[in-house]
Amino acid sequence: MSQSINAILPTLSPAHLAHLTASALTTDVIAQRGYCTLTTYEQLRTRGCSTTQARLAPALGIPLWDVEGHQRGWQLRPDTPRARKRDSKPNKYETPYGQKNLLDVHPSMQSLLSDPTVPLWITEGVKKGDALTSHGACAIALMGGVWGFRGTNPLGGKTYLPDWGHVALNGRQVW
């Protein structure tokens, strides 16, 4: 690992940096999002994780960015994931309990959301969205799987996320 990379990304462990670059993310995109290595229980708790989730430290911390350009929430990728109850497969990503769904948009792509002439990619997962961003594509990452385009209203009804009001879709090429 070169000295310059460590200087640019001082809050990211070499293992986490290697994982991200192996997933086709550039160091600029990694730095702009603010990926970080979280090594302690306290660091995970301050990001909204439950006590059970916080015990999974160390983890890759993934800040989430909303359609208005605000950092709003976190997703975590524990180094040693816990098994899902339903099928015992690893739960690779953790989202703090109670955190609401949002359309995640890399900070460098915020200004392109309202331009219907810019092609748009919609994908499941921040890392995939950031890989597209690393290659110049405007991408929205859905949180919470393929149903991440929607949320729940105060009465428990399923509704489209209000974030969609910031995304121009008229005549836009969307994948």
Language-model features, listed with the residues they occupy:
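Short, small/acidic-rich helices and loops at N termini and domain boundaries
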Residues: 1-64
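Phosphate-handling DNA/RNA-contact segment within nucleic-acid enzymes
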Residues: 45-173
